[in-house]
Amino acid sequence: MPGPVTSRKALAYAVAAIVALTAIIAWRSASAKKATAEQDVHPVPVNLNATLTNEMSDTSSLDGFDKMVKNYLTYWAINGASLSVMRNDSLLFAKGYGIADTDKEMQPGYILRMASVSKLVTAVGIMVLRDRGLLTLRDKVFGPDGILCDSIYNAAIKDTLYYRITVEDLLRHKGGFSKRGGDPMFSTRWIMMQNGWTEVPTQERLMELQLKRRLRFVPGTAQEYSNFGYLALSMVIEKLSGTDYETFMQENVLRPAGCVDFHIAGNYYKHKLPNETRYYVQHDDEPADEFNNSGRKVTRCYGGNNVTGLSGAGAWAASTPELALLVASIDGKPEVPDIITRESVDLMTEYFDESTYSLGWNDTKDSYWTRTGTFAGTSALIKYFPDGECWIFISNTSTYKGPGLAHHTAELFDKLRAKYSSKLPARQMFYPEPQEDEESQSDEKNWFEF
């Protein structure tokens, strides 16, 4: 039989175990309450594209608003468009106008190609890598010490100025690339003909071809808008993440922001996603040579360019509500949690001068953040205003104005804001309305109000 000392030790061990177990239970309970409280502060967004409908933004106080938008589409012969309005990270309005496809009304849940607005998405991906310590904006991109240091690329470089190109240079269109002789991202057919290629060049082959060319200016000393520079950034993301560009962006940028329906667009109507719109050009637009040098003539928005091959320079498709949610996730406001650090937000939106692009944004002068995108079948505009409102418009039709249409869309935004900003419903459509039982109901404002 155990002695008295042994019995006392056993009793002490038992008491200690009970105390420890009680502490663990209390800690877990407190942690659970804390987690629940945090979830209450920042609710999880719903699948916006499967939830939002035009009827949710129908109100008699905005009848004149709808008329102005419809008149705008009629004037520019635009078949359909999506418009979303956000204020201080709250989605107030989301509506489709015109048609999404034959006999299909445009709804806010339809996704549309966004052209160069894709560059903003890519820039966010770069900033996510920066926040994780995987790169700095000063990192060199090419050469033996660069990120894209593959031997095949190093062997292709003839102009040593390539060794000076930094990640920031690419983000600001200061890499030294030139579109003289054609933009390589929109000259696939000519590139195939000039090089005797029978297959559409991969991004790796395009990169090798570009690196054989001389740069137009010393990197960082001037700027020239470059789609190729953002293809290079897409490849930087792939190299550092070890996965393909679309997958990395969806898993590490878009889904953390609550955006579940962003996709790299296809080239042809047969490749469109179930909730993607049809694209249109003007009725007098001449058929184009197919980008793959097949010898066929095609509608310019379906095969005239290698849209998929644009990757992070212009290939994304999304709805305007989800695009608004992404902007809310990178704007530094607390209402929707940001997916990048405050420092990265400031870096992206810092304004220098008219000859310096912002990071991903076209321009951020006086806190007016602007991002545009245009190619056959698409015109897109994001306009973020100093008062916290953000207006996003994407059409499924291109016009003879080309990139110039964005200027007229911005004028439409100004007119609508002047007349109807105060009449927009005060609500939060990014998140579902919370369900309360009778005991918890009160007259106080809920989190979805402001």
Write out the residue ranges for each language-model feature:
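Catalytic loop of the DD-peptidase/beta-lactamase superfamily, centered on the K-T-G motif
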Residues: P2-K95, Q250, N292-F450
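Hydrophobic (often cysteine-bearing) scaffold residues that line and stabilize catalytic clefts
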Residues: S61, F65, M114, S118, ...
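Residue-level signature of the cytosolic catalytic core of signaling kinases
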Residues: S61, F65, Y110, Y163, ...
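Residue-level preference for non-acidic, small/hydrophobic
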Residues: V69, L83, D89, K119-T122, ...
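Short active-site loop at a secondary-structure junction
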Residues: T74-S82, D103-D169, F217-F228, S311-G314, ...
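Solvent-exposed serine/threonine-rich low-complexity stretches and specific carbohydrate-binding patches
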Residues: G98-I99
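Short, surface-exposed loop or secondary-structure junction motifs
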Residues: A155-Y368
